[in-house]
Amino acid sequence: MDADVNLKTLPYRKCVGIVVFNHEGKVWVGRRLMTLAHADIDRSHRWQLPQGGIDEDEKPLDAAYRELYEETGIRSVKLIKEAQNWFYYDFPQELVACTLSNKYCGQMQKWFAFQFTGELSEIVINPPPDGNKAEFDQWKWIDLESLPSIAVSFKKHVYMKVVSEFRGSLRSL
């Protein structure tokens, strides 16, 4: 890690996280593409939910719709619920030097749950629509409760909160 980076002085990056339920109550997850920053991560723990930064002057819900489309091609969704609180996680020290140009110590995320109302053919990840950069090389539907077990270690506690926050959302599907 860059010796000049003091994690305690870096802010959290504002972003959104997105849970997409299908008609069976399963959750969409994508497997992150391998990068140098993720070289040490076991392939079985590279699965994650769509997420991304909130642009300046952008509302979190608008960012959620935008990020979901940019990463997955999905537009056909119905909002189910917005998490009441922001969830935080810290980047591991070894990732800070190569993640977002040493500008952030981690992420603060506003989470949203949506119901997918489209056709599977709408889901396009590699390459995603409109020239967006691919983030995933595979995707699948899984049980909500399985999220923490497939996540990278530094996101597990956030995924446990996501499960707790949206567990009741299954009843509204």
From Swiss-Prot:
Its EC number is 3.6.1.-. It is an enzyme of class 3 (hydrolase). Keywords: Hydrolase. PROSITE patterns: NUDIX, NUDIX_BOX. Its cofactor is a divalent metal cation. A motif (Nudix box) lies at residues 52-73. InterPro entries: Nudix_hydrolase, NUDIX_hydrolase-like_dom_sf, NUDIX_hydrolase_CS, NUDIX_hydrolase_dom, RppH. SUPFAM superfamilies: Nudix (SSF55811). GO terms for molecular function: bis(5'-adenosyl)-pentaphosphatase activity; guanosine-3',5'-bis(diphosphate) 3'-diphosphatase activity. One of its GO terms (biological process) is nucleoside phosphate metabolic process. Residues 11-164 form the Nudix hydrolase domain. Belongs to the Nudix hydrolase family. RppH subfamily. PANTHER family: NUDIX HYDROLASE 26, CHLOROPLASTIC (PTHR11839:SF22), UDP/ADP-SUGAR PYROPHOSPHATASE (PTHR11839). Accelerates the degradation of transcripts by removing pyrophosphate from the 5'-end of triphosphorylated RNA, leading to a more labile monophosphorylated state that can stimulate subsequent ribonuclease cleavage. This is RNA pyrophosphohydrolase. It comes from Bartonella tribocorum (strain CIP 105476 / IBS 506).
